[in-house]
Amino acid sequence: MTKTTDSIEKKVLLHAPLSRVWRAISDSSEFGSWFGVTFEGPFVAGAPLRGAITGTKVDPEVAKLQKPHEGKPFNIQVEQMEPERLFSFRWHPYAIEPGMDYSSEPTTLVTFQLDETPEGVQLTLTESGFDQIPLERRAKAFAANEGGWSHQMVLISKYLANADQAH
């Protein structure tokens, strides 16, 4: 496979029913619980949504890594919501510099695609559009999100495996 600088792809096999996985990625409260964000409302296709980094409730070690960013804005533009199949949003990757206005920068597209398999649900996460990010931020944003999405795939697995977290 050719290494690309424009997109990140991560896959994880989740041992949970499709409806449960869908809820974990499409319900803003559940998503925020494992991802480490508190949103101001629900995910609605075509609508912007504001949030703030709060730290994951699933893994204390990852929560420690998120701690320096707690309270920072986490704003997205929800793109698509196709029940039990696809959820996508746009955001400004690695937009963590205090006082920096990222609104004029291009965004990347984050897509969660779900596919049922005999063993569970295959979640394929793709974030694309890094080649459009300003050069001075591009490599750092790509590297941070490459590692960040690896953590997030572990977090959603833990979230779904923990019966106490299930609503």
Label every model-predicted segment:
Residues 9, 29-74, 167:
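Short beta-edge strand/loop motif at the mouth of beta-sheet-based domains
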Residues 129-167:
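A conserved amphipathic terminal alpha-helix motif
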Residues 53, 91, 125-127:
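Residue-level recognition of conserved beta-strand positions in structured domain cores
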Residues 1-5, 26:
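Extracellular beta-rich ligand/substrate-recognition surface
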Residues 6, 106-110, 122, 151-159:
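Lipid interaction determinants
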Residues 40, 57-118:
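Hydrophobic-ligand binding "helix-grip"
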Residues 7-14:
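Short amphipathic
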